[in-house]
UniProtKB/Swiss-Prot annotation:
Protein known as: Sulfurtransferase TusD
Xref: Gene3D superfamilies: DsrEFH-like
Domain of life of the native organism: Bacteria
GO cellular component: sulfurtransferase complex
Cross-referenced Pfam families: DsrE
Active site per database record: 78 (cysteine persulfide intermediate)
Keyword Magnesium: no
Entry's localization field: Cytoplasm
Main enzyme class: transferase
Oligomeric form and interacting partners: Heterohexamer, formed by a dimer of trimers. The hexameric TusBCD complex contains 2 copies each of TusB, TusC and TusD. The TusBCD complex interacts with TusE.
Role this protein plays: Part of a sulfur-relay system required for 2-thiolation of 5-methylaminomethyl-2-thiouridine (mnm(5)s(2)U) at tRNA wobble positions. Accepts sulfur from TusA and transfers it in turn to TusE.
Length: 128
């Protein structure tokens, strides 16, 4: 089956993001296709390059990035939610005349159209 996941919780502070990541790995291990992960609302914090957990903590942001590089899973974050929460890429930093970007490589700023497309092209969309 072809799946998409929507994550609405931050990398730390709630169980949503870590549960979504465990579900993503389980899907791939069972031979399913994970087309994309869409990060919405507080979920956009999963794409913050500046997140620095303690050395003895699980680095959820970097593990999402590995999901992209190792399995080709699209990691889309809602551009409107991201900008409201201070997550920007190089293009938006230039447009807004900000000194730097903080979007983790492997993540892409996207509109809600990416979520709509996933819901049309996937067999299941699971929200965390």
């Amino acid at each position: 089956m072809r799946y998409a996941i929507m994550v609405t919780g931050p990398a730390y502070g709630t169980q949503q993001a870590s549960s979504a990541l465990q579900f993503a790995h389980a899907l791939l291990n069972e031979g399913h296709e994970l087309a994309s992960v869409f990060f919405y609302r507080e979920g956009v914090y999963n794409a913050n390059l500046l997140t620095s957990p303690a050395s003895d903590e699980y680095d959820l942001v970097r593990v999402w990035q590995k999901l992209n590089t190792q399995h080709g899973v699209a990691l889309n974050i809602c551009v409107a939610a991201a900008l409201r929460r201070g997550i920007i890429d190089e293009t938006e930093a230039g447009r807004l005349e900000l000194p730097s970007a903080n979007l983790q490589p492997g993540f892409t700023l996207s509109g809600l159209g990416a979520l709509a497309e996933a819901s049309l092209t996937c067999d299941r969309v699971v929200q965390f």
